């Protein structure tokens, strides 16, 4: 949404009534209305039997390519990009470990496509492979070898690999620069190249990527028909599972009726579910998806209370009530805030009951404290706005990295994960704002501020940077673009072994950043979800693959 979780309050003036002080911002209503209120699953036993049989065929296929490492990495890449890698994690991890162990032997290969593909797959899975494997393709003047310049597939592979660069890897910076400049003139004639330039694999959400790549793979003459059939069937089965989940969430939202009762707020529960699908789409994370969708939908409403509707006095009462986390505090709130407050406490109580059943009740307190921390920063930003105070960048970012809600969402994303080993130490780690979380929060905050600047009457990083440096908005945006690129490199570095946490945890942090990158690149596709986001949701949650 427009500065989705960066709160601000209306500017107060003298001799005005409470209602005069409220800002009036017009957001479009839900584009989905009651569309998802009644979705039957429709998954048949025949479909599940077919899926299992085809899955076994793909396992056999993976085993058959054991001795041909080029065929192996091509198959692994296709499996992952088709969105079915989660079925074969054990087999893929085993294969990549073997490839990594023989990396120095196979690194003598002079095919840029193969070298870049191997590098990317290993970096994707956290292996600390060196970037100097590309030195032989770039001369001392920073020019690519002639054989690479004329190799479109190799250039595309190099582009994708160089997006996994880390700080200080100048050769990957140069590779990204060169490959991008050579691919851009070809984008209008190639859907694959155009989509890669718009969203490289490193920033692509699995379900969206699968939807696009299935149609590309279908046209590949070297495609494996069994793998293609499996990917299509799996996509459609998952879609039915997600539709059924969304039906239950849509009914909960309909019962709350906050979209009608709080007309100043954005009604975006379907968009919120789509957001969370980007964090985890696999069937086993259904409880986590349900809780996270409800949390993000409620946070969106709370953000609009601080950003659009609340007066400073009301916001202080609301903040105090949430910090107390006591239903008796509801009596101190105006009617419209009572609706939200009661729903908020009820939502966390529901999840707490679920966690008690799983003997994981301690997790809720971490999530609750992060929500309290979030609204506390909302209140501080509201005070800035009322006093017309513009902080310096350091002061702003210290608060804004929290008010961007990314840290709250990252912690909360772990609460409903069952089956995977998530411990109290993991929650302690993530709530202490580790480097990967701070880097992801920078991406969230700055991308959000750039697309929202000038739309809302609020203080943002753009204002702070312009004032502090006496520069134009264009210069500020340029600087933030550099900082976002640096933050992605920091994410890549934290992803590589040795890691500070398990992949199960780190992938949530990175996936949240990928969602932000999708929704806030160039425009606010959450606040205005009626065009781009609507079409993306249709592709993932409405239309099956034929």
UniProtKB/Swiss-Prot annotation:
Any GO BP annotation: diterpenoid biosynthetic process
Entry binding sites for Mg(2+) 2: 303, 307
Co-factor binding comment: Binds 3 Mg(2+) or Mn(2+) ions per subunit.
Pathway per the UniProt entry: Secondary metabolite biosynthesis; terpenoid biosynthesis
Binding residues annotated for Mg(2+) 3, in chain numbering: 448, 456
EC numbers, comma separated: 4.2.3.75
Sites where the protein binds Mg(2+) 1: 303, 307
Record's keyword terms, sorted: Lyase, Magnesium, Metal-binding
Pfam families: Terpene_synth, Terpene_synth_C
Reactions this protein catalyses: (2E,6E)-farnesyl diphosphate = (-)-germacrene D + diphosphate
Span of the annotated motif DDXXD motif: 303-307
GO molecular function: germacrene-D synthase activity; magnesium ion binding
UniProt keyword annotation of Magnesium present: yes
Cofactor: Mg(2+); Mn(2+)
Domain free text: The Asp-Asp-Xaa-Xaa-Asp/Glu (DDXXD/E) motif is important for the catalytic activity, presumably through binding to Mg(2+).
Family: Belongs to the terpene synthase family.
Functional description taken from the UniProt entry: Sesquiterpene synthase that catalyzes the formation of germacrene D from trans,trans-farnesyl diphosphate (FPP).
PANTHER family: (-)-GERMACRENE D SYNTHASE (PTHR31225:SF221), OS04G0344100 PROTEIN-RELATED (PTHR31225)
Protein name as annotated: Germacrene-D synthase
Organism: Ocimum basilicum
Encoding gene per record: GDS
């Amino acid at each position: 949404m427009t500065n989705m979780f960066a709160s601000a309050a209306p500017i107060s003036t003298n001799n005005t009534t409470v209602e005069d002080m409220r800002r009036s911002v017009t957001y479009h209503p839900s584009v989905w209305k009651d569309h998802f209120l009644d979705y039957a699953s429709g998954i048949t036993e025949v479909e599940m039997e077919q899926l299992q049989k085809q899955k076994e065929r793909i396992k056999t296929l993976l085993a058959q390519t054991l001795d041909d490492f080029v065929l192996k990495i091509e198959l692994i890449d296709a499996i992952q990009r088709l969105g079915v890698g989660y079925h074969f994690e054990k087999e893929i991890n085993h294969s990549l470990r073997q490839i990594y162990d023989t990396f120095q032997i196979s690194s003598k290969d002079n095919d840029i496509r193969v070298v870049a593909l191997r590098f990317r797959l290993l970096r994707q899975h956290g292996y600390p492979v060196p970037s100097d494997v590309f030195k032989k393709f770039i001369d001392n003047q920073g020019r690519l070898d002639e054989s690479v310049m004329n190799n479109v597939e190799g250039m595309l592979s190099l582009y994708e690999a160089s997006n996994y660069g880390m700080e200080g890897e100048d050769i990957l910076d140069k590779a990204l620069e060169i490959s991008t400049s050579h691919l851009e003139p070809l984008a209008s004639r190639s859907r694959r190249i155009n989509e890669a330039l718009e969203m490289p694999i490193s920033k692509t959400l699995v379900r969206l990527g699968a939807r696009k790549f299935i149609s590309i793979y279908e046209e590949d003459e070297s495609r494996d028909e069994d793998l293609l059939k499996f990917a299509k069937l799996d996509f459609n089965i998952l879609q039915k599972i997600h539709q059924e989940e969304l039906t239950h969430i849509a009914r909960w939202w309909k019962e709350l009726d906050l979209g009608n009762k709080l007309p100043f707020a954005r009604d975006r529960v379907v968009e919120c579910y789509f957001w969370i699908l980007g964090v985890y789409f696999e069937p086993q994370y259904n409880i986590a998806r349900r809780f996270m969708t409800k949390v993000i939908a409620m946070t969106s409403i709370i953000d609009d209370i601080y950003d659009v509707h609340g007066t400073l006095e009301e916001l202080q009462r609301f903040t105090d009530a949430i910090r107390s986390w006591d239903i008796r505090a509801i009596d101190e709130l105006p009617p419209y805030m009572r609706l939200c407050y009661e729903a908020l406490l009820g939502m966390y109580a529901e999840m707490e009951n679920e966690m008690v059943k799983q003997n994981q009740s301690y997790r809720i307190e971490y999530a609750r404290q992060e929500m309290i921390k979030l609204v506390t920063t909302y209140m501080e930003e509201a005070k800035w706005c009322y006093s017309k105070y513009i902080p310096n960048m350091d002061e702003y970012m210290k608060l804004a990295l929290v008010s961007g809600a990314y840290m709250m969402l990252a912690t909360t994303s772990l609460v409903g994960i069952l089956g995977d080993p998530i411990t109290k130490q993991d929650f302690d780690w993530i709530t202490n704002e580790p480097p990967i979380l701070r880097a992801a929060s920078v991406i969230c905050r700055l991308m959000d501020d750039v697309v929202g600047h000038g739309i809302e009457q609020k203080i943002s990083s753009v204002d702070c940077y312009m004032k502090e440096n006496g520069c134009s908005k264009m210069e500020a945006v340029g600087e933030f673009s550099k900082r976002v690129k640096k933050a992605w490199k920091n994410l890549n570095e934290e992803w590589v072994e040795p890691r500070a946490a398990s992949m199960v945890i780190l992938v949530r942090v990175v996936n949240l950043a990928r969602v932000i990158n999708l929704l806030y690149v160039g425009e606010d596709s959450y606040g205005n979800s009626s065009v781009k986001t609507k079409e993306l949701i249709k592709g993932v949650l409405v239309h099956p693959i034929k």
